Curated annotation (Swiss-Prot):
UniProt-listed PANTHER family: RIBOSOMAL PROTEIN S9, SMALL RIBOSOMAL SUBUNIT PROTEIN US9M
Record gene name: rpsI
GO cellular component: cytoplasm; small ribosomal subunit
Any one GO BP annotation for this protein: translation
UniProt-recorded name of the protein: Small ribosomal subunit protein uS9
A Pfam cross-reference name: Ribosomal_S9
NCBIfam families registered for this protein in UniProt: PRK00132.1 (NF001099)
Family in the record: Belongs to the universal ribosomal protein uS9 family.
HAMAP family, per database record: Ribosomal_uS9_B
PROSITE patterns the record matches: RIBOSOMAL_S9 (PS00360)
Alphabetical keyword list: Ribonucleoprotein, Ribosomal protein
Keyword Ribosomal protein: yes
GO molecular function: RNA binding; structural constituent of ribosome
Length: 129
């Protein structure tokens, strides 16, 4: 296994780079503990789901740099980056992560605003008569 595994995960407009090194289980996001960065329990669990699912939380130290978007997109990007790093460390984990859909890049993006309208789909009120 390589000393440092470097992977990228994206979600909406967020981009996360994960650096996986053998260690004792510390996870830092933008040089802050994960508990401090993702204060919301759900977003934290979503971000760390690949580690808990594969039961590898105590085997690796994870350093994550994430930028762009909001916390929801960032937690999704972190999750994908960690999942990709785990598959690079151990190919046997790919099947487990694949069944939980953690290796799939979520293609949903914000729909663009169209001209002549207020928002992407919202139209002005229509009057028949």
């Amino acid at each position: 296994m390589k000393e440092v595994i470097d992977t990228v995960g994206r979600r909406k407009t967020s981009v996360a780079r994960a650096f996986l090194t053998p260690g004792k289980g510390t996870v830092t996001v933008n040089k802050r503990p994960v508990e401090e960065y993702f204060k919301d329990e759900f977003k934290r669990q979503q971000a760390l789901r690949p580690l808990t699912l594969c039961e590898k939380a105590e085997e690796f130290d994870v350093k994550i740099n994430v930028q762009g978007g909001g916390l929801s997109g960032q937690s999704g990007a972190v999750s994908l980056a960690i999942a990709r790093a785990l598959t690079e460390s151990d190919e046997a984990l790919r099947a487990v992560l694949r069944t939980e859909r953690l290796l799939t890049r979520d293609p949903r993006m914000v729909e663009r605003k169209k001209f002549g309208r207020k928002k992407a789909r919202k139209r002005f009120q229509f009057s028949k008569r």
